[in-house]
């Protein structure tokens, strides 16, 4: 991490163990982001984006993944207090509903019950109801375990990748029901969240959805245990909350489209650097991940820009650059090999059906040459059965003495 950090980041990580600070420095942004309401940022491609953050901490068991919880608790304190009032009002409405007889007119549910901080155990209907109640505000959940994402449904299926894509793009989400007491709503998905997982479970969870844009929309962090450093937490008290309050207040007060030319120039430099490194190394995975990683780092810089009173600083810039490199390192380190494998399979599927293996072979060829062609297409090495079929169908003939195969003229398989 940079030695000198923006005050807000430095303040939020100062009480967590040293080895946890990089992950916490990234993990606080989902909670910071939900304080922004009706705020958009101009991107380098001319579009606008809201402060959407989905942070996943992938680290060994008992490594301190919960270190982010206390800073997040203080960040969300004002919103949780507001939620408490609306939760009580909602419970009063439920109680009055239960007191009414079956033939009595039921009281209408209040339409201003905005609750932004949700528990991790929720039904899809409850989630849709909370989004509808929020009226454009962001929701937040600390999912603890990444598997809890499967509670939610898109198109009747537990499609985690689709939910992540909708979150990042603020896509439309909801459900359609016919019952009078059922939740029917369809709204733009504004939901920031934190989740954690162990390394093997995380790799298994995302396997099969690494090249469809799912991983690139996440912000990944990790914890590398260091047994030589003591695992000690600092003190969270009223002074900690008081020092944090001005920064939270500025986020709450912000409105409209926020533009910072220094931040845009930084984002352009970061993207150019990533593309240059990808070109020089020939690393397709790095290039695929870099564009959205730059966007995520830029959004962090803009949140800090607002929180620090619309003041740009070298500390914000250096932190954003470090955050980008850290995010890309974590993604490539934990998922790079699997992404490469999935990309290769995708290429094979794309080509399959359009490439005639017989046309890829010379007029005279051996079984070894057929095996090589099959490998290039991602097939297994067993060519014997295919060659027998080709001989039977008179696409080729075999010289039993030499073992050489020869194509029949004007024949194609």
Protein language model regions, located:
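Phosphate-handling catalytic cores of nucleic-acid transaction enzymes
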Residues: 1-413
């Amino acid at each position: 991490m940079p030695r000198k950090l923006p005050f807000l980041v430095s303040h939020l990580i100062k009480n967590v163990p040293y080895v946890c600070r990089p992950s916490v420095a990234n993990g606080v942004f989902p909670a910071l982001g939900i304080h922004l309401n009706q705020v958009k940022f101009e991107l380098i491609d001319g579009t606008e984006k809201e402060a959407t953050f989905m942070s996943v901490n992938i680290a060994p068991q008992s490594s301190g993944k919960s270190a982010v919880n206390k800073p997040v608790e203080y960040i969300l304190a004002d919103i949780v207090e507001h939620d408490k009032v609306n939760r009580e009002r909602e419970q009063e409405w439920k109680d009055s509903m239960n007191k009414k007889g079956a033939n009595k007119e039921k009281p209408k549910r209040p339409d201003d019950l905005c609750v932004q901080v949700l528990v991790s155990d929720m039904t899809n209907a409850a989630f849709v109801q909370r989004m509808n109640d929020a009226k454009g505000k962001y929701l937040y959940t600390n999912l603890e375990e990444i598997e809890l994402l499967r509670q939610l449904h898109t198109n009747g299926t537990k499609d985690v990748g689709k939910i992540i894509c909708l979150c990042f793009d603020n896509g439309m989400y909801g459900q359609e029901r016919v019952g009078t007491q059922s939740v029917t709503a369809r709204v733009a998905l504004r939901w920031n969240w934190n989740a954690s997982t162990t390394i093997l479970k995380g790799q298994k969870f995302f396997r099969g959805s690494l090249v469809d844009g799912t991983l690139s929309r996440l912000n990944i962090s990790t914890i590398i245990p260091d047994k030589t450093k003591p695992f000690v937490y600092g003190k969270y008290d009223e002074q900690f909350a008081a020092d944090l309050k001005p920064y939270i207040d500025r986020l709450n007060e912000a409105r409209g489209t926020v533009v910072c030319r220094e931040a845009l120039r930084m984002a352009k430099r970061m993207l150019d650097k990533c593309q240059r490194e990808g070109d020089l190394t020939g690393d397709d995975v790095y290039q695929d991940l870099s564009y959205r990683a730059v966007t995520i780092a830029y959004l962090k810089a803009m949140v800090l820009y607002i929180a620090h009173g619309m003041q740009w600083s070298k500390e914000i810039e250096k932190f954003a650059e470090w955050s980008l490199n850290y995010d890309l390192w974590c993604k490539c380190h934990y998922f790079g090999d699997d992404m490469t494998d999935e990309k290769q399979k995708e290429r094979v599927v794309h080509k399959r059906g359009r490439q005639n293996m017989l046309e890829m072979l010379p007029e005279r060829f051996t079984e070894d040459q057929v095996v090589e062609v099959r490998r290039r297409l991602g097939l297994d090495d067993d060519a014997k059965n295919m060659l027998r079929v080709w001989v039977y169908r008179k696409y080729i003939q075999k010289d039993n003495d030499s073992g050489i195969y020869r194509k029949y003229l004007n024949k194609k398989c």
